[in-house]
Swiss-Prot record:
Function noted in UniProt: Attaches a formyl group to the free amino group of methionyl-tRNA(fMet). The formyl group appears to play a dual role in the initiator identity of N-formylmethionyl-tRNA by promoting its recognition by IF2 and preventing the misappropriation of this tRNA by the elongation apparatus.
Catalytic reactions of this protein: L-methionyl-tRNA(fMet) + (6R)-10-formyltetrahydrofolate = N-formyl-L-methionyl-tRNA(fMet) + (6S)-5,6,7,8-tetrahydrofolate + H(+)
Keywords (A to Z) from UniProt: Protein biosynthesis, Transferase
One annotated GO molecular function: methionyl-tRNA formyltransferase activity
Protein name: Methionyl-tRNA formyltransferase
InterPro entries membership: Fmt (IPR005794), Formyl_trans_C (IPR005793), Formyl_transf_N (IPR002376), Formyl_transf_N_sf (IPR036477), Formyl_transferase-like_C_sf (IPR011034), GART_AS (IPR001555), Met-tRNA-FMT_C (IPR044135), Met-tRNA-FMT_N (IPR041711)
Top class in the EC scheme: transferase
Pfam family, one: Formyl_trans_N
SUPFAM superfamilies tied to this protein: FMT C-terminal domain-like (SSF50486), Formyltransferase (SSF53328)
Residues engaged in binding (6S)-5,6,7,8-tetrahydrofolate: S111, L112, L113, P114
Enzyme Commission number(s): 2.1.2.9
Cellular component per GO, a single term: cytosol
Keyword Cell wall biogenesis/degradation: no
Amino acid sequence: MKKIIFMGTPSYATCILKALVENENFKLVALFTQPDKAVGRKQILTPSDTKAFLSQNYPSIPIFTPSSLKDKNIIREIKDLNPDFIVVAAYGKILPKAILDLAPCVNLHASLLPKYRGASPIQSAILNKDEKSGVCTMLMEEGLDTGAILESLECDIKDKNSSEVFELLANLAAKLILSTLLNFDKITPKKQEESLATLCRKIKKEDGLINLQNARELYQKYLAFTPWPGVFLENGLKFLELELVDELKQNAKMGEILELEKESFLLACKQGVLRIKKLQESGKKALDGRTYLNGKRLKSEDSLC
């Protein structure tokens, strides 16, 4: 039975953690995750998704939430646990060489590396209109997502939002980690092709700001930034549900309401047309498109804003 230290934080990581802890070939000896965070208006201290799952279902397994992995005591703790593998998935901390040298460190990255190294591989793939994505296992080294590839699985992501793709890739990753660890000695690591490498940065709230220039680009932003940070106009109006109707139409005025439907409306961009199904003004409740227009006394050929 191989001893595993798992390092991960969000629900994507929990799916992988669950697969490992339930498999009879592995013994989870510790979880490392981010410290509890103050969440919401009341700033309630909340554990990470992985910590909540493990403490509720496997309370005897130790959980560590260090602020730094460079602490000599933390490195000693990991060494004393004597893991066969350290598995990392969306942990949010960089592993120092002192830890990388203790055992094979296998990272599960939510892209087909070397494409989309960094913090937002799923959102970046959607923004770039990729129809395929995937997950890969990688031998970690000191660079950011630069290690040799062990195995990978790919899937179709066309017209899926980030939340849906996260779930899809988490389930793939849960299968992939079992395959990689069980066949580790038979796998020949494959060096990444540096000339094909791309980087992606962390998503910020302001990335959700949109204009009505291009319907296709707005639609891709909507998919990429669901559930967070969402998409919103400069006046704070959020588009919560929308569909791409036409990406080429150009003979209407930007922002013009083209047609009212039962629970939605068609909106003209400078290029293309969107169906707005649900939207929300800042500080107010969400409304379906038709109800929102009725409340504002807006009709066909009026400007939305």
